[in-house]
């Protein structure tokens, strides 16, 4: 278990992130496939007849405990991660957009995208419980620590691939106004999944000179996995399976776009706004080792659960073996067990407005608001984010400086550039380097239109 928790932390620290991917470039005046991933209606605003996406890549991490200086210092990451009383929250999110193509025909825009996703999360984990599992000790003395949480504490990871069909249509185009609608139809290819969670955990951790046990406790526990993520969590190659289970899910995005045109400049606008609802769908994992099992934990009297037995666990299968150990039969009862594993995507509302201030100067405001409770064990996770992005935009060059806030790591600031079809940026490079920022990210890509 120690290695599982640290694997999430180290993978996230090596592959660092902000939840709002491609911030700045996805609302660029240039438009195209990246803008359509943000809002499918934007595909009708393509500035070229054809667009080819070679690759786009975004990798990012946000957390509420570890700063960039912590990761580069000689201090023990475990100690920093479980320091204080606030629950530990960490989000890793990686997106790969592979070869993709889009074209315009009359009032229509069409696109075909290939993509792959990795998410790994630590959600609302009690710091003292995490310290006990990770370190195997709360101190060298005899201590008792109360645990009381109404949250669903989770360790969770998901990989999957997608093939997306994009359709947009212009439904109004006057000298001053333009309105588009669109949809993304996404075929989902589950890769691998793992979840270990404990909801409504109440009890007492007892440390008897390094022997940690849980007494007088109750909780609802879920363990579920599919594919290679049932195996060693510290093996990063297990996070590379994206299309292994074929088409076993569907999702949809819906979008609306309004543009106040600039009558004196056909290549620009005064205002561009959009509203999209994303991730309406779910996927079903169908690997041979599928498991979705729920337990009821009830410990009273002289009974206890030995926490030390989780210390060196490296896989979900090992955790399941401990939970099913006859020695724990009196305190852990199976309430349901199934091979069915259906995981929902986190539905998000995306709203943005891009205002032209003067000639080539713009400012964009965006809101990404989740409308699903992603603390539930059958959902992948996301987070709310808000950004303000001043931008200079010419035909072949753009520079922008995202200022953002999200619910996990707080305020961030970064910078990005586009030179013809190549772009590179970070939503948080300034805040990460100038202070104890708890978020970092990088994205880049190559695309061209003709």
Kindly label every feature range from the protein language model:
Residues 14-18:
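Sec/Tat signal peptide C-region and signal peptidase I cleavage site
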Residues 19-450:
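Subset of outer-membrane beta-barrel
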Residues 4-13:
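Sec-dependent N-terminal signal peptides
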């Amino acid at each position: 278990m120690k290695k599982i928790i640290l694997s999430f932390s180290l993978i996230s620290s090596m592959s660092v992130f902000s939840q709002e991917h491609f911030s700045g470039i996805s609302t660029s005046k240039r438009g195209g496939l990246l803008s359509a991933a943000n809002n499918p209606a934007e595909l009708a605003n393509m500035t070229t007849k054809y667009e080819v996406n070679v690759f786009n890549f975004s990798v990012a991490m946000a957390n509420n405990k570890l700063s960039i200086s912590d990761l580069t210092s000689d201090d023990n990451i475990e100690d920093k991660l479980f320091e204080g009383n606030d629950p530990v929250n960490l989000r890793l999110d990686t997106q790969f957009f592979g070869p993709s193509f889009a074209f315009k025909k009359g009032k229509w825009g069409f696109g075909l995208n290939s993509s792959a996703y990795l998410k790994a999360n630590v959600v609302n984990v009690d710091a003292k419980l995490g310290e006990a599992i990770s370190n195997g000790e709360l101190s060298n003395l005899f201590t008792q620590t109360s645990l009381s949480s109404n949250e669903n504490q989770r360790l969770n990871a998901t990989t999957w691939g997608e093939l997306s069909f994009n359709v947009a249509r212009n439904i109004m185009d006057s000298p001053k106004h333009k309105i588009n609608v669109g949809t993304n139809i996404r075929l989902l290819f589950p890769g691998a999944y793992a979840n270990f969670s404990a909801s409504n955990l109440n009890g007492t951790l007892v440390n008897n000179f390094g022997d940690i046990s849980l007494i007088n406790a109750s909780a609802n526990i879920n363990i579920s996995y599919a594919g290679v993520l049932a195996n060693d969590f510290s093996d990063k190659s297990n996070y590379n399976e994206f299309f292994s289970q074929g088409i076993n899910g569907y999702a949809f995005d819906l979008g609306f776009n309004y543009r106040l045109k600039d009558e004196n400049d056909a290549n620009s606008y005064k205002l561009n706004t959009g509203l999209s609802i994303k991730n309406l769908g779910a996927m079903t994992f169908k690997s041979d080792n599928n498991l979705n099992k729920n337990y009821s934990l009830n410990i009273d009297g002289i009974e206890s659960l030995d926490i030390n037995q989780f210390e060196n666990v490296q896989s979900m299968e090992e955790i399941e073996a401990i939970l099913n150990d006859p020695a724990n039969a009196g305190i852990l009862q199976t309430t349901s067990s199934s091979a069915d594993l259906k995981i929902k995507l986190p539905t998000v509302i995306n709203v943005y407005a891009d205002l032209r201030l003067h000639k080539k100067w713009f400012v964009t405001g965006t809101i990404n608001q989740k409308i699903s409770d992603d603390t539930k064990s059958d959902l992948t996770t996301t987070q709310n984010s808000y950004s303000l992005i001043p931008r200079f935009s010419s035909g072949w060059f753009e520079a922008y400086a995202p200022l953002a806030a999200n619910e996990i790591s707080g305020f961030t600031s970064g910078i990005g550039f586009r030179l013809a079809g190549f772009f590179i940026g970070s939503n948080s490079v300034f805040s990460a380097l100038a202070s104890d920022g708890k978020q970092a990210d990088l994205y880049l890509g190559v695309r061209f239109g003709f």
